[in-house]
């Protein structure tokens, strides 16, 4: 581990992205360390908060009870950088490709609550605050109530992937491994402000599903509705300039095929 990496602390490291960051060599800890006196080591210069409040997206969510507010207080008191893992959901229905300058007009509770937390922490931390608005991350995640997790469960259990939208619906998908690599690179020298994190590639959901089935070795894709719904792609120009990291359509589809093969083998530990 480099000295630079040692100056970063991943809190909420038990989640999907948190574990991936720790797997890249970043020190991690549960979010409970934020409540402990001296819990954040003296050598830390940057906190990446990778935890998620279980109430987020629900009516009973309270930002005062979200531990991310505690992380922000520690960062402000000690002059640390804080990297927030936000979501493309804060943009709502903004036209694609969505730039960081697009107005934030979230259309659901999750997006509205994420945006409210962004503004709350920005006011407190100023230039020491970096917001990463992340596209659709996918990994080997059967059992998770995510788009990709539900897709894997149904393929394994029923031999099919079922959509309630057109398979031509294009979205910005990014493999978990690439997401973690990009976040780590940005956290080594936090730029401040907003950075979109995604592939920047409008990939048809049907193509992603077919790649998973190719890896699995079988399966069928069925659709109960032909409506194109929630298409989006992020403009990742700033991410490219800051990290030098680029994704390709082939890399995304290869990751999906590998996940399908892993599902067939049944040997990996679910996320």
What are these regions (language model features)?
Residues 2-27:
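N-terminal Rossmann NAD(P)H-binding glycine-rich loop of SDR-like oxidoreductase domains
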Residues 7, 45-46, 81:
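Structural motif
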Residues 36-77, 90:
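NAD(P)H-binding glycine-rich loop region in Rossmannoid oxidoreductase-like domains
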Residues 164-166, 172-271:
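C-terminal substrate-binding subdomain of Rossmann-fold SDR/epimerase-dehydratase oxidoreductases
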Residues 70-109:
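Conserved Rossmann-fold NAD(P)-dependent oxidoreductase catalytic core, especially the SDR/UDP-sugar
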Residues 11, 50, 82-88, 92, ...:
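SDR active-site strand-loop-helix element
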Residues 119-170, 176:
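NAD(P)-dependent short-chain dehydrogenase/reductase
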Residues 67, 95-132, 136, 143-144:
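Catalytic helix-loop patch of NAD(P)-dependent Rossmann-fold dehydrogenases
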